[in-house]
């Protein structure tokens, strides 16, 4: 989006979005790259046109790529300063060893430094294909209208050499591997720990029950000043025994697997063992 397209300059693209009163952004997760727009009902067609133009006609100028490379390197530095992000990256690395889900979203620094324009264009040609993309609308948009917009703007997309059938995946399901990693830093003021078991996928019938279970176990943070009795029984135990500064339960789902667990921060170096004992005993 920062490079402009064959039909729109970067400035022209920004001005067009601003004049619509719209919001245009993109993000990458461990499984998807998403380009999205929020616009008024009357501007849905133009919003889809803009997204289509970005996906299919981006210029990828060398100077713009270098600017974005610097942005990503700075972003990576900021992520590495956030202990919670580092802990969850390590958790994914050991839970899904040797698999795509075990990699970080930004990737290693050497890849960011070495990626070239040819790498990007080859990736777009091989991955931005009709069988690997989905157009989704929510809110003030009619289904039939969105179908027509998809036909208008995306019908010319090629398909992969080995097309992916709707509702299937070309990859093996993620394999959860029980393991452990510890990173010691004697200068750190807190112990930051994540413990997880294999969770469920988005399409699992247990997806919503696992979210309910996450809510039952709850979250707690001493700095918020709320009474431990207002949350789960576990929060009362943690508060009374000074086991942690805070904890939160999480249920992270992917297309074919997931992680369910707890993340805790504590100034008490022995609290990990005690909190784990309460978790396994089912003290809610």
Positions of PLM-derived features:
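M16/MPP (pitrilysin/insulinase) zinc-metallopeptidase core fold and M16-derived inactive scaffolds
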Residues: 1-38, 81, 219-220, 224-243
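Active/ligand-binding-proximal structured segments within catalytic/core domains
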Residues: 1-17, 63, 91, 128, ...
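Scaffold signal of the M16-like zinc-metallopeptidase fold and its non-catalytic homologs
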Residues: 4, 79-131, 149-153, 220, ...
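Buried hydrophobic packing residues in well-ordered domains
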Residues: 17, 35, 51, 72, ...
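Helix N-cap motif at beta-to-alpha junctions
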Residues: 40-43, 139-143, 267-270
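An aromatic/glycine/proline-enriched structural segment found at the starts
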Residues: 97, 101, 105-113, 129, ...
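A structural supersecondary motif
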Residues: 194-201, 217-268
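Conserved small/polar residues in nucleotide/adenosyl-binding loops
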Residues: 273-280
């Amino acid at each position: 989006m920062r490079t402009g397209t064959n039909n729109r300059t970067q400035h022209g693209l920004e001005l067009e979005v601003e004049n619509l009163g719209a919001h245009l952004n993109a993000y990458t997760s461990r499984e998807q790259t998403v380009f999205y727009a929020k616009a008024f009902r009357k501007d849905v067609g133009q919003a889809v046109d803009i997204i289509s133009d970005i996906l299919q006609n981006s210029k990828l100028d060398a100077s713009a790529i270098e600017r974005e490379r610097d942005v990503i390197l700075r972003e990576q530095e900021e992520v590495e300063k956030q202990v919670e992000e580092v802990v969850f990256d390590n958790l994914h690395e050991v839970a899904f060893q040797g698999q795509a889900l075990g990699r970080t979203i930004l990737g290693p620094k050497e890849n960011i430094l070495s990626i070239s324009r040819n790498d990007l264009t080859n990736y777009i040609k091989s991955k931005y294909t009709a069988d690997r993309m989905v157009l989704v609308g929510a809110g003030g948009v009619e289904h039939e209208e969105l179908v027509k917009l998809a036909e208008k703007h995306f019908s010319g997309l090629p398909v992969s050499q080995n097309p992916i059938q709707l509702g299937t995946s070309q990859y093996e399901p993620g394999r959860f591997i029980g393991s452990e990693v510890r990173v010691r830093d004697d200068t750190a003021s807190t112990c930051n720990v994540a413990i997880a078991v294999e969770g469920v996928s988005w399409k699992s019938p247990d997806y919503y029950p696992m979210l309910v279970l996450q809510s039952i176990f709850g979250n707690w943070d001493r700095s918020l000043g709320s009474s431990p009795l207002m949350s789960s029984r576990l929060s009362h135990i943690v508060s009374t025994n000074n086991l942690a500064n805070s904890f939160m339960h999480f249920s992270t789902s992917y297309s074919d697997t997931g992680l369910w667990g707890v993340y805790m921060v504590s100034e008490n170096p022995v609290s990990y063992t005690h909190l784990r004992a309460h978790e396994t005993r089912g003290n809610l």
